[in-house]
């Protein structure tokens, strides 16, 4: 059985597919850049656009398309010459836990994992539709891949209505019930440690380069109402940290929870184990992130 924490510690580049709803918020943009600026740890095979639906989109399909365009924009800011394949993902969520939603992204995930001579790490930071669809289309990829997903809240949290998970509950059920080795980065109760502020972002990034200026403006705009003492969790970077800086994540191996139809956790100690991240070391992770961004 693959010892994921030990594999992650190895100082070699990992083959990575990044699945992102890049236009949903502002944290995906930081994460795409962080991955591209960490070539000693990350070899990006592809970036896939995930669906989302909130005030920044009119439908899951619109959210996916906006994310696709935002991915291209960020890749261009980091390195205009970068040759990273980018794929459109699902236009809707899974109808149930048995039927995939086929897309260019899901097909690319299947192909890239099957073609690889090494373990492929799928880092998913949005609704899990593309990855769940790939697993339904080709269950064999679970033997050659590891999934790192930022989704769900901490196991002790009073509810599990977390954005990424709650959008596609059948998709979450697919991945938690599958055989793919899984690392879960919970949101509330764990990622809430990874917080920053506009003054901190401006201090380290403002004026450094076009990418940094874009990230500063994104962060400022997210507090459009000018709320005092405002802070922002840059959630998604913690998922890429599993590949880039695993020393900043406290991981434990426990039985996988069951995802109920109401998105709650249920427990069966006989279930396959997975890796659960229970703590983020905020300061060294931000130090690494800011250093790489300002040197872009």
Task: Annotate each language-model stretch with its function.
Residues 2-65, 92-198, 281:
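Active-site histidine-anchored catalytic micro-motif
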Residues 78-82, 180-181:
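Structural alpha-beta junctions
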Residues 90-95, 222-226:
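Short glycine/proline- and acidic residue-enriched helix-loop micro-motifs
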Residues 82-88:
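Ligand-binding beta-strand-loop-alpha-helix segment within the catalytic cores
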Residues 1-14, 27-44, 166-173, 185-296:
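Conformational coupling and interaction surfaces
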Residues 62-79:
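Short, structured active-site "lid" loops
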Residues 68-71, 106, 237:
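A general structural signal for well-ordered alpha-helical segments in protein cores
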Residues 51, 88-90, 258:
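A general secondary-structure junction signal
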């Amino acid at each position: 059985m693959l010892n994921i924490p030990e594999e992650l510690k190895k100082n070699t580049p990992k083959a990575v597919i990044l699945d992102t709803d890049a236009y949903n918020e502002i944290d995906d943009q930081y994460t795409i850049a962080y991955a591209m600026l960490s070539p000693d740890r990350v070899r990006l095979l592809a970036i896939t656009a995930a669906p989302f639906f909130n005030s920044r989109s009119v439908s899951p399909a619109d959210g996916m398309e906006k994310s696709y365009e935002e991915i291209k924009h960020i890749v261009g800011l980091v390195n205009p010459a970068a040759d990273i394949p980018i794929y459109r993902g699902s236009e809707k969520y899974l109808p149930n836990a048995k039927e995939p939603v086929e897309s260019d992204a899901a097909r690319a995930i299947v192909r890239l994992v099957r073609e690889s001579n090494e373990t492929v790490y799928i880092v998913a930071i949005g609704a899990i539709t593309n990855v769940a669809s790939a697993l339904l289309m080709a269950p064999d990829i679970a033997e050659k891949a590891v999934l790192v997903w930022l989704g769900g809240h901490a196991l002790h949290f009073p509810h599990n209505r977390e954005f990424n998970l709650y959008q596609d509950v059948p998709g979450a059920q697919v991945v938690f019930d599958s055989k793919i080795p899984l690392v879960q980065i919970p949101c509330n109760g764990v990622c809430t440690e990874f917080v920053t502020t506009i003054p901190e972002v401006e201090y380290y990034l403002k004026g450094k380069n076009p990418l940094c200026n874009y990230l500063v403006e994104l962060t400022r705009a997210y507090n459009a109402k000018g709320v005092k003492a405002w802070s922002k969790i840059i959630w998604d970077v913690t998922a890429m940290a599993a590949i880039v800086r695993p020393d900043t994540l406290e991981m434990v191996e426990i039985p996988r929870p069951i995802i109920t139809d109401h998105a709650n956790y249920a427990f069966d100690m006989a279930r396959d184990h997975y890796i659960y991240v229970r703590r983020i070391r905020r300061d060294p992770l931000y130090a690494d992130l800011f250093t790489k961004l300002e040197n872009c």
